[in-house]
Amino acid sequence: INTEAFPSPFEFLAKREWEWTARDRGLFLASSKSLNKLPNRTKRKLFHKIEAPYRTTSVQAGFTATVHERTLENVYQQHLVEVDGQTDILTMGIPFISPYNPESIMNPILVMCMGLGYLFNMYRGKPLVREGGVVIMTHPTYEEFHPVHHPSYIDFFDEVLADTNDPAVMWEKKYAEDEWYRHLYRTSYAYHGVHPFYAWYWGAHGQQHAGKVIIVGGYAATVRKLGFTPASTMNDALEIASDTVGRSPTISHLHVPGVLVADVK
């Protein structure tokens, strides 16, 4: 599919800010001020009601290995963006949705998964940020979970992350074989009990690659429990990052939406 993530009048969200028209800027200001007055639940409900006007760009079918090669060709043709070298600091805004929270809550585990899993890994060859560099993400990172969709995520956050945030030593077997989680998975709308582990593993590469991960605007206690550093503003985050990358770092911003694959040279 293409990258038309937002219909009118929200298409400005998929544009680079310097491309905004006067109308776009007006819509942004009006939307921001309105959203700031609403409770989180209402804001989520409004965002999830937006239907993307996606269109199909290609269809592949047949033998898996052959289809995979052809699919990659089309993905690279559509999404590949050439980037000149790695950066010291990578900034990115984490959206309100991920593959695992449609009509649901973007909980702290999914913030980690979306940032250090999906967005960090959207590259070919090597990551946008150098090894030992700093990743700065912006997201409110509320300690909020959907009890029907993500019951094991709640326990993962309270129980597992209180013990460790190193996926190599986590207690996956207990969650995978828990009968109550299995029951909810089979009879309700819950993800499997082991799902938060896989979400965490998906972000583990980015977590291990970066020298420091900072979340701007996140609830401080929640951010620290994830193993990251909280910051109130982007300026604060850059000051914190200077301890890792020095006072004159290179900075790259991954603008989402749209979706891209960085081809780092």
Q: Each PLM stretch: what is its role?
A:
Residues 104, 109-213:
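C-terminal catalytic subdomain
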Residues 1-86, 117-121, 127:
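Conserved, well-structured core segments that form the ligand-binding/active-site neighborhood
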Residues 97-101, 143-148, 221-224, 259-262:
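Flexible loop/turn segments at secondary-structure boundaries
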Residues 66-82, 117-125, 189-207, 232-244:
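A short, acidic, amphipathic alpha-helical segment used as a generic capping/interface helix at domain edges
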Residues 88-93, 136, 252-253:
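Structural motif
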Residues 3-5, 94-96, 141-143, 257-258:
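Glycine-rich beta-alpha junction loops
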Residues 45-61, 89-114:
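Glycine-rich phosphate/diphosphate-binding loops and the adjacent beta-loop-alpha structural elements
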Residues 9-14, 201-265:
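Extended hydrophobic packing segments that form well-structured cores
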